[in-house]
């Protein structure tokens, strides 16, 4: 009811048509009178009705252009006494739409004799309200030619975009497969035969030392890198294949102190020695030293039978040796003392490689005078340890085996900070003093 009252207040003429009640215009507004009407009785047809051609599928119900005196009424109802304006508003040329059968209809404004009047030109609210009562069968909206063309273009563009994406994806996959380097069918990775070496020398004389890929094409199963390395490391005429001299070892040591393990740069300072040769010589010397150490030989015997390069490698790789690093970095740690006295676990102090204090102390205790070693007598040693326990000494044919009481051994080693290597050296000095070596 509120909607009806508001609608009658704002649209009195439409309310008179829709609701068709007997209320007068004065009921809606005092200024309105019944002297004129914009809606005439449709049963009374004029003698000369105006006919307009409008293309449509449905019959258009019309009303007579009413003699409205106010300007807003003519614009509101879409009617006017001006025939030119009325024709411009409601006469539309027939258009042919694609995919739609064109049927022209000549309908007059007075074709329907029903009491209900249709006010041509009104939209939205009125037509939606009347559509529920099925009084008018409104046609479904159809796309115009331009809209249909635009939709088709959008669909075609989407299809083209998807097609281009698929093409790009396939192209990237194909390029990835094409750019992937193809492996040689059968690459020989074994040793070079004398026939291959001879052929390689001939090809290098013919093509030089720059065109290795071209040379590799003439050697079945070989690539350019293999040919280059074989030539520079083995087949080059100026390569030295004899043993290493002391002078070359000194040059190698000096260069290694300056630039480290840069074998290619070191090879420039050693004519006739290739990068591979220098590296192999270094590693072979290092392996020999390690194998001799693992066999149980002490540092004294290693130093007596080693050359300059071995001594340098031992000094460089001292911190890399796990056993020696553990001895050097341990501040206090247990050591199993063998060769002197009983097997006793004692705590030893840190051992410094560059410090020879233990040798000096040992020599002073042994009484080195005028190049002659004076060993303390066994009686004095046993007397010093008689306060606690007794001691004994025994000798064998090949060497001297001494067994001293634990208090004497522990106190002497702790005082001088000896470890297993030190004790072996002291035992060696004792054997020299007794003339056993």
From Swiss-Prot:
Cite the entry's keywords alphabetically.
Answer: Activator, DNA-binding, Nucleus, Repeat, Transcription, Transcription regulation
Q: Which compartments is it annotated to reside in?
A: Nucleus
Protein name in the entry: Transcription factor MYB118
- Whose protein is this, by species? Arabidopsis thaliana (Mouse-ear cress)
Q: At which positions is motif Nuclear localization signal?
A: 152-159
- InterPro entries on file: Homeodomain-like_sf, Myb_dom, MYB_TF, SANT/Myb
Function noted in UniProt:
Transcription activator that recognizes the motif 5'-TAACGG-3' in the promoter of endosperm-induced genes. Promotes vegetative-to-embryonic transition and the formation of somatic embryos from root explants in a WUS-independent manner but via the expression of embryonic genes (e.g. LEC1, LEC2, FUS3 and WUS). May play an important role during embryogenesis and seed maturation. Together with MYB115, activates the transcription of S-ACP-DES2/AAD2 and S-ACP-DES3/AAD3 thus promoting the biosynthesis of omega-7 monounsaturated fatty acid in seed endosperm.
What cellular component GO annotations does this protein have? nucleus
Q: Where is the HTH myb-type domain?
A: 184-239, 240-290
Protein's UniProt keywords contain Transferase? no
């Amino acid at each position: 009811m509120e909607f009806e009252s508001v609608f009658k207040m704002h649209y009195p003429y439409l309310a008179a048509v829709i609701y068709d009640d007997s209320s007068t215009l004065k009921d809606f507004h005092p200024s309105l009178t019944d002297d004129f009407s914009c809606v005439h009785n449709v049963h009374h047809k004029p003698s000369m009705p105006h006919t307009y051609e409008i293309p449509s599928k449905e019959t258009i119900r019309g009303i007579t252009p009413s003699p409205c005196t106010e300007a807003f009424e003519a614009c509101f109802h879409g009617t006017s006494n001006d025939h030119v304006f009325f024709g411009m508003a409601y006469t539309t040329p027939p258009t042919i739409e694609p995919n739609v059968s064109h049927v022209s209809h000549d309908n007059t404004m007075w074709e329907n004799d029903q009491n209900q009047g249709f006010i041509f030109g009104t939209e939205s609210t009125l037509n939606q309200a009347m559509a529920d009562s099925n009084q008018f069968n409104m046609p479904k909206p159809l796309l115009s030619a331009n809209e249909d063309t635009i939709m088709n273009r959008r669909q075609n563009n989407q299809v083209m975009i998807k097609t281009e994406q698929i093409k790009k994806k396939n192209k990237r996959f194909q390029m990835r497969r094409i750019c992937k380097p193809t492996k040689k069918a059968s690459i020989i990775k074994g040793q070079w035969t004398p026939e291959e070496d001879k052929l390689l020398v001939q090809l290098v004389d013919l093509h030089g030392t720059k065109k290795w890929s071209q040379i590799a094409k003439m050697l079945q199963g070989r690539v350019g890198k293999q040919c280059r390395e074989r030539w520079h490391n083995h087949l080059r005429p100026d390569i030295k294949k004899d043993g290493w001299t002391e002078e070359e070892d000194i040059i190698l040591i000096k260069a290694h102190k300056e630039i480290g393990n840069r074998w290619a740069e070191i090879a420039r300072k050693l004519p006739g020695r290739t990068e591979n040769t220098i590296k192999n010589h270094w590693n072979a010397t290092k392996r020999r030293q390690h194998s001799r150490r693992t066999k149980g030989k002490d540092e004294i015997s290693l130093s007596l039978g080693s050359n300059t390069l071995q001594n340098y490698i031992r000094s460089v790789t001292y911190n890399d040796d796990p056993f020696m690093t553990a001895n050097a970095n341990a501040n206090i740690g247990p050591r199993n003392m063998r060769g002197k006295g009983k097997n006793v676990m004692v705590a030893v102090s840190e051992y410094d490689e560059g410090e020879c204090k233990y040798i000096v102390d040992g020599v002073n205790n042994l009484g080195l005078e005028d190049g002659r070693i004076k060993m303390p007598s066994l009686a004095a040693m046993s007397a010093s340890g008689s306060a606690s326990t007794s001691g004994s000494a025994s000798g064998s044919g090949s060497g001297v085996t001494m067994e001293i009481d634990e208090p004497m051994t522990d106190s002497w080693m702790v005082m001088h900070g000896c470890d297993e290597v030190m004790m072996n050296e002291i035992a060696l000095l004792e054997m020299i003093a007794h003339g056993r070596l």
